[in-house]
Amino acid sequence: MIPTAIPQPLAPTPPPFTERRYVVTFIFVVSLFMLWGLGVTMGDILNKHFQQVLHVSKANSAYVQAATFGAYFVMGLPAGWFMKRFGYQKGVILGLSLYAAGAFLMIPAANAASFGFLLLALFVLACGLGTLEAVAHPFLDGLGDPASSDRRITFSHAINGIGAVSGPLIGGYFVLRGTHAAGDLSSVKTLYSIIGAVVGSIAIAFSFVKVPPLNAEHTPGTATAEGGTSPTPLAADKSLFQHKHFVWACVAQLFNTAAQGGTWAYFINYGTEYVGLSSHTAAYFFSLSLVGMMIGRFLGTYLMQFIAPNKLLAFAALANIGMCLLVAQHWGTVSFVALIGLNFFFSIMFPTIYSLGLKDLGRHKQLASSFIVMGVVGAALFPRFVMGPVANTSVAHAYYLPIICYAVVFLYGAKFYKVQRD
């Protein structure tokens, strides 16, 4: 008797990245990631510029980060409520409108040469950034098969890296290059008038885009394109804050963004004081470090096929503890290379904490997204009130402080990420 071959099951076909009907909408939404990456890192250029032109202290210049990331905290829940009431498209238009309004407010603020007025303008601008970030993640989730949403979000965060790299390059060219020659804020007015015009144009264009019905409309507990929610799943009987892995994700994101905000706020100061770079040149090295962050996201996406995301997160946190120890020694080029390397390991932290925290939340996922985004307030408080007083004496020694933050992120990746199934 001739043995018959046992048929082998075919490997499952991976779900499509997105669908043809969503391509135009997808391009617009992905562009939002680049826009807010640009807006966030531009603030770190202004930090140094305001020190030189407005003669504010290093600690007080960190109010730039406080205004920027504090807006994320303020807008987190309102953006979520607006999105549920009016839908994703109107949420995006609201975010872009606030972004453009804040950019245009920088013009009279620069004319007045008022640090407080400039902070107010940045706060309005960052309210737009926070709204975009709260809306864009669940919006992307609906632009295709839910099984491929992780790939869409990871790809979009890589595009965010392009904007993040562009911020210091553009800011260094327009702003820091002219600091000593002009001694005023005219370059700030030029830069932000261009940004306001571009962002406003995108808002107008997006208002004319016809968004097809989203797949998320058929997922329990998610927003529809027109607003409102679909039915609640039976699996999510617990209240949101009874999900301990979500609560720990909020804590981990708070400390993660605190460390990131502090590192970015004093990067240029470190380059000028310990390596002898000009502010303009240090800004380009900051961009180089953000290229490393973008590469880290692509590499992390690949490695997650073989290594559990929580393990990569824990490893990255340990690596950055070591980097901070090197930076704090101010050993010239060696320490500066370690400072550049911090962003490489930052790369996977925000999206990984975000995705781990949203697992198995059912009807709570949308509100949970807003709370995790609100964790960005750590970047508002830590640079000014924790690192700032130390940086006034020693910028290098201030880099001991983020070690505490990375220890918390490590604990989340090693233990507290687990979903408890009661």
Regions found by a protein language model. Give the residues of each.
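Central cavity-lining transmembrane alpha-helices of secondary-active solute carriers
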Residues: 63-81, 287-299, 378
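Cytosolic juxtamembrane N-terminal segment immediately preceding the first transmembrane helix
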Residues: 1-36, 52, 238
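Helix-to-loop junctions at the C-terminal end of transmembrane segments
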Residues: 75-88, 175, 296-308, 390
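Extracytoplasmic gate region of multi-pass secondary transporters
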Residues: 43-47, 168, 238-287
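C-terminal ends and interior cores of transmembrane alpha-helices
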Residues: 97-112, 318-331
